[in-house]
């Protein structure tokens, strides 16, 4: 086996890329997309409320 200086870095990138791909596939294949979108909407609204409260204090 040939060892290169970048082999550890590239293998880490490949592993994380595979994890991200599997996660996205799970979201799209198993209907998690709607739940995820609902979560993002709720989280966005919560952050907007926090921003409004912080701006009101100034």
Swiss-Prot record:
Pathway: Carbohydrate metabolism; tricarboxylic acid cycle. GO terms for cellular component: mitochondrial inner membrane; respiratory chain complex II (succinate dehydrogenase). One of its GO terms (biological process) is tricarboxylic acid cycle. It is found in: Mitochondrion inner membrane. Keywords: Membrane, Mitochondrion, Mitochondrion inner membrane, Tricarboxylic acid cycle. Coiled coil: none annotated. Signal peptide: none annotated. Its main location: mitochondrion. It is a peripheral membrane protein. Component of complex II composed of eight subunits in plants: four classical SDH subunits SDH1, SDH2, SDH3 and SDH4 (a flavoprotein (FP), an iron-sulfur protein (IP), and a cytochrome b composed of a large and a small subunit.), as well as four subunits unknown in mitochondria from bacteria and heterotrophic eukaryotes. This is Succinate dehydrogenase subunit 8A, mitochondrial.
């Amino acid at each position: 086996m040939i060892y290169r200086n970048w082999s550890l870095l590239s293998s880490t990138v490949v592993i994380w890329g595979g994890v991200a791909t599997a996660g996205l596939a799970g979201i799209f294949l198993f209907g998690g997309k709607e739940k995820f979108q609902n979560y993002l909407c709720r989280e966005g609204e919560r952050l907007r409320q926090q921003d409004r409260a912080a701006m009101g204090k100034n």
